[in-house]
A protein has these predicted regions:
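Conserved acidic carboxylate
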Residues: 15
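Acidic, metal-coordinating helix/loop segments flanking the phosphotransfer/catalytic sites
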Residues: 38-66
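Alpha4 helix (beta4-alpha4-beta5 surface) of REC/receiver domains from two-component response regulators
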Residues: 69-73, 77, 90, 99-117
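Hydrophobic/aromatic residues positioned on beta-strands within the core alpha/beta folds
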Residues: 95-96
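Short, flexible coil/linker segments at domain boundaries that flank nucleotide/cofactor-interacting
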Residues: 4-8, 87
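C-terminal output helix
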Residues: 44, 120-131
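Two-component/phosphorelay signaling modules centered on CheY-like receiver
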Residues: 18-37, 42-43
């Protein structure tokens, strides 16, 4: 994908750390001007997924503030719900600070996500490249 690959793309960022969410948004917008939507609200997230208008979801594995039907929900479970609600193939990139051996593989296997990004992310180019590579597959 070229430098304009994110132009006109809609990316939903689900991240409960405001600083990390801002970093993700700025990095992706600078990489081509795509529209980044921030949300931690599960009904809003599922509405966006069902709309068919998203091009990618960047989803934190360890959500601490998200609830669904009166109970806490994590990013792995939310990923499955997003995939189920989307009317078309919707790439999901999980973001996680869990770096123990096998964590990423387990998250990918149990969530149905398309990729995993290890946090903290110090280089925005790594984030942008992961997003672009998943959009190439869509």
């Amino acid at each position: 994908m070229n430098e304009l690959a994110l132009r006109g793309k809609r990316i939903l960022i689900v991240e409960d750390n405001a600083l990390v969410a801002k970093f993700f948004r700025m990095a992706l917008e600078r990489a081509g001007g795509g529209e980044c939507i921030l949300s931690e609200d599960v009904p809003t997230i599922l509405h966006h997924a069902a709309s068919g208008e998203l091009d990618l979801v960047l989803l934190d594995v360890s959500l601490t503030n998200s609830e669904w039907e009166g109970r806490a929900i994590n990013g792995v479970e939310l990923c499955r719900m997003v995939k189920e609600k989307s009317p078309r193939r919707l790439p999901v990139l999980l973001a996680t600070a869990h770096a123990m051996s096998g964590d990423r593989e387990r998250f990918l296997e149990t969530s149905g996500a398309d990729g995993c990004l290890e946090k903290p992310v110090y280089d925005s180019a790594i984030l942008v490249e992961k997003v672009r590579s998943l959009m190439d597959l869509a």
